[in-house]
Amino acid sequence: MKNVTHSFVFLAHWPFAGSFGLNTDILATNLINLTVVVGVLIFFGKGVLKDLLDNRKQRILSTIRNSEELRRGTLEQLEKARIRLQKVELEADEYRMNGYSEIEREKENLINATSISLEQLEKSKNETLFYEKQRAMNQVRQRVFQQAVQGALGTLNSCLNTELHFRTIRANIGILGAIEWKR
């Protein structure tokens, strides 16, 4: 029994903790707020950004696969053109014996047309990949910016109540009044 009453007497002699106050150091407060906002953005935005990048990666890979299929088709056409070229060369040998040179021109035109077609397809593939990459980067930038703004507004709205707002305004008016008084 004596120990129990001694404990209550001991608690009565403890000093009280300091009171809760408003930190008026704007630079330190903003640094803390920015740290919290950046931490929240990283924590919540990491998953969304990863999903967005994964989706974009799948689209780009799909575009690459499509381009590769086009390339294979073009190579098949090239192989057919080579077979046709061989046939034309055989015919050319026959016509050369007869003195015709028209087949040689047809061969060159066929090779040039196939080469131009391949170059155009390769150029088209490269342009498609470039524009898809640019579009993906722009979408990611826009999404990250929107999430950052929404997160910051949410944090501000949840932390800023009317009483805190009025106290901040009064403190700033006091600071401005002190500056005006010094002039």
Swiss-Prot record:
Q: Keyword set for this entry? A: ATP synthesis, CF(0), Chloroplast, Hydrogen ion transport, Ion transport, Membrane, Plastid, Thylakoid, Transmembrane, Transmembrane helix, Transport
**Single Gene Ontology MF annotation:** proton-transporting ATP synthase activity, rotational mechanism
The record gives the membrane topology as: Single-pass membrane protein
Q: Where in the cell is it found?
A: Plastid, Chloroplast thylakoid membrane
Task: Name any GO cellular component annotation.
Answer: chloroplast thylakoid membrane
Which InterPro entries does the UniProt entry name for this protein? Answer: ATP_synth_b/b'su_bac/chlpt (IPR002146)
Residue ranges of the TM segments? 25-45
Quaternary structure, from the entry? F-type ATPases have 2 components, F(1) - the catalytic core - and F(0) - the membrane proton channel. F(1) has five subunits: alpha(3), beta(3), gamma(1), delta(1), epsilon(1). F(0) has four main subunits: a(1), b(1), b'(1) and c(10-14). The alpha and beta chains form an alternating ring which encloses part of the gamma chain. F(1) is attached to F(0) by a central stalk formed by the gamma and epsilon chains, while a peripheral stalk is formed by the delta, b and b' chains.
Record's miscellaneous remark: In plastids the F-type ATPase is also known as CF(1)CF(0).
Role according to the record: F(1)F(0) ATP synthase produces ATP from ADP in the presence of a proton or sodium gradient. F-type ATPases consist of two structural domains, F(1) containing the extramembraneous catalytic core and F(0) containing the membrane proton channel, linked together by a central stalk and a peripheral stalk. During catalysis, ATP synthesis in the catalytic domain of F(1) is coupled via a rotary mechanism of the central stalk subunits to proton translocation.
* PANTHER family referenced in this protein's UniProt entry, alphabetically: ATP SYNTHASE SUBUNIT B, CHLOROPLASTIC
Similarity section: Belongs to the ATPase B chain family.
User: Which HAMAP family does this one have?
Assistant: ATP_synth_b_bprime
Please identify the protein, giving its name as recorded: ATP synthase subunit b, chloroplastic
Q: Organism, per UniProt? A: Sorghum bicolor (Sorghum)
- The gene is atpF
